[in-house]
């Protein structure tokens, strides 16, 4: 049974995240943690916009916060977000990974170690290589992996890089990702 969804996005990610979050039903009782490479001054505006489009609570993650259902956590600007063994969030200012902090790989890897087969990892649009290695780690630990179709993504580099590293479980258009999450969570 799926207990957590983790998502990574960069260039074009605001639109992509808005599309799939808006389609998640209130009945879906899971948490979502997102790393989005975004400018520091935009996160507050984004969170309030997304809160009006989804039935989930959308918020900036806090240190030692328990991961709770029906909540979407965003990594704060300039902090890596990590999943701890006790299923809480920790924040770190460790060195950048793939030129990024927050790093998608850091989130994906720590979530894979804790949630294993109870995890869905989703890599969306983006113009760097962050997220591919972490998504592979999710697959190695038995989690499900979804990559936005590089052919239709706003920026294809991140999803394409993942498909060259390994074979994700699903490569699908952004409009169909929420439906796939629902399907996997009800199996």
Task: Give the role of each language-model region.
Residues 1-187:
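Conserved acid/base catalytic micro-environments in cytosolic active-site loops
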């Amino acid at each position: 049974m799926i207990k957590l969804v983790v998502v990574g996005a960069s260039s074009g990610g605001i639109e992509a995240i808005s599309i799939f979050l808006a389609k998640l039903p209130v009945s879906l009782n899971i948490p979502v943690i997102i790393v989005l490479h975004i400018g520091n001054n935009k996160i507050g505006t984004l969170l309030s916009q997304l809160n009006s489009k989804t039935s989930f609570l959308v918020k900036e993650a806090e240190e030692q916060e328990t991961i709770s259902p029906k909540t979407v956590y965003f990594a704060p600007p300039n902090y890596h977000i990590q999943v701890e063994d006790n299923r809480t969030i920790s924040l770190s200012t460790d060195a950048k990974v793939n030129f990024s902090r927050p790093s998608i790989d850091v989130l994906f890897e720590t979530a894979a170690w804790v949630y294993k087969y109870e995890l869905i990892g989703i890599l969306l649009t983006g113009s760097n290589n962050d997220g591919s290695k972490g998504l592979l780690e999710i697959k190695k630990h038995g989690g499900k992996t979804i990559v936005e179709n590089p052919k239709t993504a706003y920026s294809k580099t991140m999803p394409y890089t993942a498909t060259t590293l390994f074979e994700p479980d699903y490569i699908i258009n952004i409009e169909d990702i929420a439906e796939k999450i629902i399907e996997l969570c009800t199996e």
